[in-house]
Amino acid sequence: MKLTELPEARGTWQFFDLICATPHPSGGERKLAGLLAEKAREAGLRVRADSFGNLRIDRAPAPGCGDRPGIILQAHLDMVPQKRGGSSFDFAKDPLPVRIEGNKIHCGGETTLGADDGIGAALAMDMLTDPEVKCGPLVGLFTLEEEIGLNGARALSPAFLEGGN
């Protein structure tokens, strides 16, 4: 079974599949950021990137929800690139070898899964792009290089965080 065939959480698994299929080790996550930005634009969302490469995706309030408070969802896009000793897996080029066995999702011991924070990014993208989600203003903030020193978060400027739709 593939991630995209799981019945639960519709878009979350589709986004997690995209994330797992796109190499994103620390310092190498800009391609993934570009793909998520493209998906957000396809959904009609406002997308901005700062000079470091962090993404901010804004979604307007759902109809009838303009009086609700805004929500910010934050996730980092990089993963810790660890693999089994002697493995030829290349985190800069290879998609993660995701396996589903029963109720477990893993990489068969070959590599880490990257669920920290890949699943957080997938959930945020699902919330941002799903028109059935009824909420006030929603912001997705996706930072880079968290695993090697919170570099993306440290590079955030107040101006990038202020404002909204």
Report residues per predicted region.
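Acidic/His- and Gly-rich active-site-bordering loop/insert found
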Residues: 2-102
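Residue-identity detector for threonine
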Residues: 4, 12, 22, 111-112, ...
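Short, well-ordered alpha-helix to beta-strand connector turns
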Residues: 44, 163-164
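Active-site metal-coordination/substrate-binding segment of hydrolases
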Residues: 65-137, 142, 157, 163
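Extended substrate-binding grooves/exosites of carbohydrate-active enzymes
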Residues: 146
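Glycine-rich phosphate- or other oxyanion-binding loops that anchor nucleotides, phosphorylated ligands
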Residues: 149-152
